[in-house]
Amino acid sequence: MTTTLSAVAGQIGRGTRAELTRVSGARSILLYGLVPGAVLLPLAITLGVATVAERFASISSSIQVTSVTTTNSVYWVITFTVMIWAVVAAYAQATAERGPLGELARYLYPRRWTGLVSRWIAYGVGAAVCSAALVALVMAILPTFFPKVYAGVDIGSAAGVRFLVAVPVFAVCAVGIGVGLAAIVGHPAGTVVGLLGWAYVIENAISLVPNGYTLQNYMPFLNGTYGTGQELAFMPPWGPTGGLVYCAAIAVVLFALGCAAVALRAKQVGGRRRSGGRHRQIDR
């Protein structure tokens, strides 16, 4: 038993280090995907909106600019940073099971689920650290440089502390959903389209169907966003903490289904290879 646990821990450790190596480098997705999409984009939009709002508040007496509170200060970080990390993790999982990389993984990781765990750990920790740093940075910058509009933003308030804790938790859950969905779908483009389509189209458009607002209570990304403390018109009956727990539960379920799907595909591929080998022997 101890030997088995040590072997599993070793595989997960190697897989996590491999993912960190894979995501870094001069031409990696870190520089061309994560930094622009998960860091620069939300910062640029947040500061751009803040600059315009502060300008109007300073020069115009005919236009009233509403002050922004803490609970609405990191919306773009939640919207872009969390989702970009989930998409990158999903793409990494989908591509890891295909082509030469997939062939190598079948030999290096006989327990196929350890590869998924490694990716959830690697990208989940990265998403948590990145989102926490951006949340802290944004809530520190806004009231300091844009006081007319963002004076009410307080990183030390209950809402600010919740953001610092809950946004990284939501990011980890979103990465788990992405990895699980990628393992189920098994195709990079299909996974990315499905993930973005669900998060940005279905979860919002479902309110237009009969009983749509009831169905919307069960949307994982909306629950996760609400669970961070972000102001939303969407208000599930189980409250913010319940929304975050629900999002985490969906992530665990999808991840488990993804592990089962990867194991099943590996078994089918192995069966076809053994069958093909027997046929070649008979032909000889």
Language-model features, listed with the residues they occupy:
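A short amphipathic helical element positioned immediately N-terminal to and/or at the very start
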Residues: 9-27
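Junction motif at the cytosolic side of a transmembrane helix
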Residues: 2-6, 246-284
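Transmembrane helix segments
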Residues: 42-46, 188-222
